[in-house]
């Protein structure tokens, strides 16, 4: 039951006020300036703080985790900056284990406490298993939604007709969120190991072969989607695979979908005339299986903070 805030749509909705509060808080910090970076100033901190809340980690540490994962995705793997970012990981991992030890002594209703009490086949998780799961949850929480939101805001910022369509038709936010999930497929590929000899569409695959699944290709399959290279905000049906499939489907899909929707809606509601500084947009360079933005600078008409 304690995993419900991640897994169950109804429970995820209870987190919506917190998401909205954080979205507007970070917009308020820059809204009077008339310019901001929608990645560094907005799309990175908001999901990171929500992730801290779910895991039970201190809110004030959001930037430590967000900066690490953002740097690992954004920087070339052969750069000294990438090496420096990776070098921060062991201390953060130890911090996660120390935090878990404190939760073991005093459990609460967060996901870390749930994992500490979780049993599989009568056994609790080892420290290594616990660290691996928490690390993956934090990584997914602080980066993938950031990437999806940033790419969405870039696309809407450079396609004013779509942006205006969404502003004029707020009932489209849910379908638009799914359509842009399909279109970008932030987690573009996943590798798997073949468990038995099989032939698929005439191609033999042998046991223990490694294969790459392309979610991006599946989400742009002309046999499944009409005009797949076009963003259609009210596309229906939309059986995209942006969150994967089967037992490995993203556990936080409902959370990520709502968070992306809330953050995009807040931007279009508060700074609807934002203009993208396209010459200074920076793509991810660190991981070929992921897509996202390192920087998304924009300008807009300065506005007042929310009262």
Q: Where do the protein language model's features map onto the residues?
A:
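Cytochrome P450
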Residues: 1-307
């Amino acid at each position: 039951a304690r995993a419900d805030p991640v897994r169950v749509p109804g429970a995820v909705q209870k987190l919506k006020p917190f998401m909205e509060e954080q979205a507007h808080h970070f917009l308020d910090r820059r809204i009077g300036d008339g310019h901001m970076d929608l990645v560094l100033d907005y799309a990175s901190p908001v999901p990171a703080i929500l992730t801290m809340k779910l895991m039970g980690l201190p809110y004030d540490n959001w930037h430590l985790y967000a900066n690490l994962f953002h740097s690992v995705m954004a920087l070339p793997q052969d750069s000294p900056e990438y090496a420096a970012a990776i070098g921060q990981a062991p201390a953060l991992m130890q911090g996660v284990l120390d935090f878990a030890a404190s939760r073991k002594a005093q459990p609460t209703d967060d996901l870390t406490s749930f994992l500490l009490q979780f049993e599989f086949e009568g056994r609790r998780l080892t420290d290594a298993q616990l660290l691996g799961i928490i690390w993956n949850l934090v990584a997914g929480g602080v980066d993938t939604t950031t990437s999806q939101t940033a790419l969405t805001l870039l696309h809407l910022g450079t396609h004013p007709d779509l942006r205006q369509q969404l502003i004029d038709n707020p009932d489209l936010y849910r379908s638009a969120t799914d359509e842009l999930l399909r279109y970008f497929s932030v987690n573009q590929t996943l590798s798997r190991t073949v468990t038995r000899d099989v032939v698929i569409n005439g191609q033999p695959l042998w046991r223990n072969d490694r294969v790459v699944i392309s979610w991006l290709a599946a989400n742009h399959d002309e046999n499944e989607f009409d005009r797949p290279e076009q963003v259609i905000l009210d596309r229906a049906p939309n059986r995209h695979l942006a969150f994967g499939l089967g037992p490995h489907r993203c556990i936080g899909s409902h959370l990520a979908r709502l968070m992306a929707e809330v953050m995009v809606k807040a931007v279009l509601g508060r700074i609807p005339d934002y203009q993208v500084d396209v010459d200074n947009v920076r793509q991810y360079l660190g991981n070929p299986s992921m897509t996202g933005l390192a920087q998304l600078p924009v300008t807009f008409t300065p506005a007042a903070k929310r009262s």
